[in-house]
Each structure stands twice: as structure tokens, then as C-alpha cells.
């Protein structure tokens, strides 16, 4: 296996086009394990850990753009993710150990495409756009399409994820997850909610995204539809849990994990929604 170090974005894209069956390595927290366990067999590794262009967090008018090489720790230390974007900071703070948060990148979390990836539900709730670059040019893909349509929208062999962009939300972004332990926990189930309330405490905007419920992280459209326009009260939150449970019953019918996940989702969804007011 060949290992090549890229110093610029242009060089990284050139190397990707030059070597077939190549893989990108940035933080290495996932891909090194995959190679060691012989789950993947790349002919070349393109190291982008020195590409400074991918390590920026930028505020652009109504948007925030996160470079694919930004680490979880970078997000936690950025003042942009205070206030109504606290849910993204919380999701990043719950990833693995300090060592993993210092090395692991947001771009790697997306491209690795684990259903348990903590950073993805908040980015789905924010309706983020992924910026993919190759020698053929630039392509923009909605993150929900990237996960829900598989090969149609998924990253191509010669493409590099360079950035994640989303519009600054008016509502509050939250995140909650259930793992098997307090630290180093891989999510068994997670929820991110983006909710905006009017002066009468009525839901005027809502996005709900889940992780680890099924094979892919996804929007929970039925819960969104139920919550929209309702006064944000405890009984409404309770009913939204039932809506999500009924949706899970259809999606996970016959799966042995359904009874556990059906019970667990109540606490996770309630925690995510309760943080809207905090």
C-alpha cells in the first residue's frame, strides 16, 4: 500500500485522481482500524491531515461553513457553537475519548457513514450541504440525500469532501443520545432537534433527525409534521414520542432490537426536546 501526503487541496484532488482504489486518511480514528481488521484493502492512502484549507470554520453572511478536516475538539472550542447551536457542540463532546475528539474529523465522521455517528443527526436537522470536489469540478449534495439515496448521491472514488455548509438557524438545535456507558459510548440511539417557537410557545419551525434507529441516520418527518403548529407543552412532547414509536414499529418490524429501541426512544426524544427551552 502506497501512502501519499497532500499539502494543499489541489494536491489532494490530484492524488485521488492519480491512484485508483485509494482512500483518504485525516484523523485516522476509523480507517486505521478498518485496515488493521482487513475490512478494507486500499491500494493507496492519501493523507490530508496537513491540508490547512480543510481546517477552517467560517461564518459567511447567513451561513456557517465547516471544513472537512475540522476536529470535534475544534467545534467544542469554537464560539460559533454556543447558544442556539449548542446541540452540535454537545454531539461532538460526546464522541469517544479526548484523544479521539482531538484527532477525529467531522468530514471523516460523515464519509465513514456509520448509523451511530454522533455529528450527523445535528447536521441533518440543520439541512446541511456537503461540498464534494474532484478534478471534474465541484458538486453539492444535501446531507439527507447523501445518506438516504446511497450510491446515487454518495461520494465517488475520485471525490474529496471539503466542507459542510448550513444556514444559521433561527431555532434552537439540541442533541441527546443513549449509549451503553457514560464515556467512549457508541450511540445506541440518538436524536437531534431544531425547534423555533413563537411568542405564544407555538412550534413554527421544526426538524428532527435520528441516528442508530435504523441502518441510516434520517429525518423523522412524521414527528416534524405532528409538532408543527402545536403549542410546545408536555402533553404534546408525550404525544410526539408515540408518533415516533409508531413510525419505528413500521420501519423495524420483526427486528429483535425493536422492543429495546421503542422503550429507549422515549427518554432520548424527551431529553432532546426539553433542551429547546434551556
Model-predicted segments: where are they?
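C-terminal structural segment of proteins
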Residues: 1-278
Amino acid at each position: 500500500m502506497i501512502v501519499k501526503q497532500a499539502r494543499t487541496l489541489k494536491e489532494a484532488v490530484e492524488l485521488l485522481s492519480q491512484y485508483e482504489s485509494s482512500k483518504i486518511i485525516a484523523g485516522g480514528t476509523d480507517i486505521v482500524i478498518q485496515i488493521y481488521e482487513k475490512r478494507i484493502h486500499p491500494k493507496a492512502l492519501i493523507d490530508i491531515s496537513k491540508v490547512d484549507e480543510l481546517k477552517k470554520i467560517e461564518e459567511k453572511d447567513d451561513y456557517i461553513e465547516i471544513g472537512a478536516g475540522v476536529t470535534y475538539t475544534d467545534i467544542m472550542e469554537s464560539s460559533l457553537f454556543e447558544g442556539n447551536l449548542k446541540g452540535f457542540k454537545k454531539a461532538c463532546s460526546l464522541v469517544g475519548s479526548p484523544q479521539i475528539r482531538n484527532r477525529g474529523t467531522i468530514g471523516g465522521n460523515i464519509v465513514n457513514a456509520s448509523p451511530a455517528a454522533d455529528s450527523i443527526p445535528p447536521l441533518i436537522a440543520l439541512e446541511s450541504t456537503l461540498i464534494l470536489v474532484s478534478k471534474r469540478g465541484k458538486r453539492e449534495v444535501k446531507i439527507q440525500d447523501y445518506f438516504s439515496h446511497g450510491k446515487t448521491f454518495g461520494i465517488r472514488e475520485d471525490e474529496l469532501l471539503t466542507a459542510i455548509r448550513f444556514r444559521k438557524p433561527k431555532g434552537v438545535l439540541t442533541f441527546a443520545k443513549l449509549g451503553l456507558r457514560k464515556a467512549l459510548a457508541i450511540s445506541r440511539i440518538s436524536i437531534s432537534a431544531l425547534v423555533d417557537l413563537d411568542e405564544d410557545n407555538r412550534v413554527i419551525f421544526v426538524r428532527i433527525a435520528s441516528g442508530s434507529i435504523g441502518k441510516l441516520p434520517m429525518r423523522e418527518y412524521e414527528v416534524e409534521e405532528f409538532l408543527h403548529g402545536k403549542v410546545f407543552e408536555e402533553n404534546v412532547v408525550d404525544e410526539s414520542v408515540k408518533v415516533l414509536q409508531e413510525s419505528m414499529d413500521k420501519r423495524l418490524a420483526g427486528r429483535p432490537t425493536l422492543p429495546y429501541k421503542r422503550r429507549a426512544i422515549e427518554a432520548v426524544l424527551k431529553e432532546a426536546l426539553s433542551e429547546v427551552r434551556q
